[in-house]
């Protein structure tokens, strides 16, 4: 109903003109670095609106979630994966690695690789900070990186691989006030092989049963001062980033690419991230409750309507009446 009312106050008109394709591939001011800086500037300006104070109050450290998603496309410019299709083109993909501040739920760092690139390469891009804890899936397991994090006093939580080799050096007691889902809390040592030099790294391994998913998980971490159930709870925060990727793929799908090289694709993906960020800011700043999908649909339909967006979204009926009277 709101979108229909907005149509009645449209005072801009589109004229039939020949569509000129913008060259995303070669436009100097619109290269990926420029767009990524714009994304960062918007996040810095409006991050306080997106921030969830409950997470900040519960944790003394800055929690950052790391994950990746693969965007499939028929490409020859990136390293190809999979079989060739009927038309002879190889199905390639670009993988988007993102870092999300747990209290903001929008990417603060994005890095692109070919779909075939191993996830753990992204860990080299992360900034080490003694006040930060990174949370990532087991696809990012890299003992060399874990040793570097530990030496730099940077925390991490991840899942251990099924085929991981380790030695249990200590079994910690589980206090009565610890969540009953904690099944074990152990100190382990793993072997780190860095350029032929082998060392031992001490880590913490926690086994936890999650009632919601009805399965057990094994986590490894270098957080020796945290409660075992807190470490398990930290990892559960990581599932927020999966919801972000799902939200983008459902509401802002990259079905069509406007250029045929890596530069153009990166720019287009960054534009989607910026749109997602701006809509998130609008949604969070409104008193009236809007679902994200309805908000996206509204903006898509009325992109060329001349209306005060936030004013209209707060009270569509009232704003429509005022505009029709004028």
Predicted regions, residues:
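Single, function-defining residue in the core of a domain
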Residues: 1-46, 53-62, 66-79, 84-326
């Amino acid at each position: 109903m709101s979108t229909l009312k907005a149509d009645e106050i449209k005072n801009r008109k589109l004229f039939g003109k020949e569509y000129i394709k913008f060259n995303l591939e070669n436009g100097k001011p619109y290269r990926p670095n420029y767009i990524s800086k714009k994304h960062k500037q918007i996040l810095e300006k409006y991050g306080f609106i997106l921030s969830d104070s409950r997470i900040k109050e519960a944790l003394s450290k800055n929690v950052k979630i790391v994950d990746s998603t693969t965007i499939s496309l028929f490409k020859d410019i990136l390293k190809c994966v999979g079989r060739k299709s009927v038309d002879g083109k190889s199905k390639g993909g670009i993988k988007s690695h993102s870092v999300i501040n747990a209290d903001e739920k929008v990417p603060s760092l994005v890095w692109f690789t070919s779909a075939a690139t191993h996830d753990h390469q992204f860990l080299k891009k992360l900034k080490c900070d003694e006040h930060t804890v990174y949370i990532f899936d087991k696809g990012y397991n890299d003992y060399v990186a874990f040793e570097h994090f530990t030496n730099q006093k940077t925390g991490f939580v991840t899942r251990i691989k099924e085929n991981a080799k380790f030695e249990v050096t200590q079994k910690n007691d589980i206090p009565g006030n610890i969540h009953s889902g904690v099944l074990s809390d152990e100190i382990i040592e793993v072997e780190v092989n860095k350029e032929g030099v082998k060392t031992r790294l001490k880590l913490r391994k926690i086994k936890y049963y999650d009632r919601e998913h009805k399965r057990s998980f094994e986590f490894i971490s270098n957080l020796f001062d945290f409660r075992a159930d807190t470490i398990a709870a930290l990892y559960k925060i990581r599932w927020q980033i999966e919801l972000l990727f799902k939200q983008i793929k459902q509401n802002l799908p990259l079905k069509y690419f406007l250029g045929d090289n890596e530069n153009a694709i990166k720019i287009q993906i960054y534009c989607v991230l910026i749109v997602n960020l701006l809509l998130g800011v609008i949604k969070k700043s409104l008193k009236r409750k809007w679902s994200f999908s309805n908000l996206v649909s509204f903006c898509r339909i009325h992109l060329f309507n001349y209306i005060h967006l936030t004013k209209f979204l707060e009270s569509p009926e009232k704003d429509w009446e005022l505009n029709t009277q004028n």
